[in-house]
């Protein structure tokens, strides 16, 4: 029921954004400030965010409906629904964040729940082996992601999307220290490594064959 409500609200949000031009970008809470770098909790809802909210909640709703019958006699029925609900929350936090720190926390939460789901049947040695491999592969991706976020924070002094995009022109004029590479290229490569290693072919290859 909760996921159905979330899907309906997401669809209403998409309608407001797409047809009425509504937009939301606010920082709700400042967690801490370290050396002038603000670590905040905030949300950005634009057309891309609204579309992804609908996709996430719709897919989650379909999974919930299918799971009601598929997992009915499994002793881990309630635990599975807890994992899927946490996965949905993590994905929504990821796509709705207005800063890189919150996005990273959502990203890590998605990785954690993926680890738990891969090893859901923990009495099977193959499942445990597969989720450990997924955990290790994810750490490689996280390293690239953290490097990219760290470079952005170091050269822009902010983690907020709006402020970063406002300084994108300045980043484009800089080179990575000790090389002739453009700084923005290095940052994009780091973020790309984080995304591809964690959630595409490498991960599927390393975990899928063990289940």
Predicted regions and their residues:
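...captures the hydrophobic TM-helix bundle architecture rather than a specific catalytic motif
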Residues: 1-209
């Amino acid at each position: 029921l909760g996921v159905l409500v979330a899907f309906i609200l997401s669809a209403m949000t998409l309608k407001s954004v797409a047809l009425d031009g509504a937009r939301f970008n606010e920082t709700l809470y400042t967690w801490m400030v370290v050396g002038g770098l603000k670590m905040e909790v905030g949300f950005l809802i634009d057309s891309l965010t609204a579309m992804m909210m609908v996709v996430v909640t719709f897919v989650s709703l379909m999974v919930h409906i299918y799971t009601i019958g598929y997992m009915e006699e499994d002793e881990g029925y309630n635990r599975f629904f807890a994992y899927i609900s946490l996965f949905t929350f993590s994905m929504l936090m990821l796509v709705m964040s207005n800063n890189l720190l919150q996005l990273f926390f959502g990203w890590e939460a998605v990785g954690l729940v993926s680890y738990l789901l891969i090893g859901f049947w923990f009495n099977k040695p193959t499942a445990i082996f597969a989720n450990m491999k997924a955990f290790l592969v994810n750490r490689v991706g996280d390293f690239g992601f953290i490097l990219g976020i760290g470079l952005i924070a170091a050269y822009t002094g902010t983690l907020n999307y709006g402020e970063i995009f406002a300084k994108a022109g300045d980043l484009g004029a800089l080179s990575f220290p000790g090389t002739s590479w453009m700084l923005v290229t290095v940052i994009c490569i780091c973020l790309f490594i984080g995304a591809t290693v964690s959630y595409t072919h490498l991960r599927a290859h390393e975990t899928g064959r063990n289940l």
